[in-house]
């Protein structure tokens, strides 16, 4: 019985993620516009964020990541990798979960690669699994927060924003990020 539930959950996740990929596929131009808007929102919410992004080897931005489910959930979003302020590729993020959940939510995700090694490790794999291929330290900051770029020591850091601002106590573990063609 338990194995049937797991199998059904996996199939549901794949169906939801697959339909999200087809139904929400944005053009390169739309993704770039969303990335620009998300970065500006991030810079406006966190003092020092612009300097931190400038120091990063690469900044991966997913402007809209939609998560939804009834018992079984899936999450999908498309974004762009920025290197030196320019788009260097397009990516998607997909994850699934099992447990009590009901509804749909949207958020933005920013991942900053702060070291050459972390950035190279991300770019060399086809499908980067957070928690397996690399860890992302989510920085929990309060409203009106600031970042001292000299005190950031993690090789990969992440920020999660909702329409109101930075979100707290969240994880990206289990998310898979893959390069896509646009």
Residues covered by each model-derived region:
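Bacterial N-terminal signal peptides
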Residues: 7-18
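Sec/Tat signal peptide C-region and signal peptidase I cleavage site
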Residues: 19-25
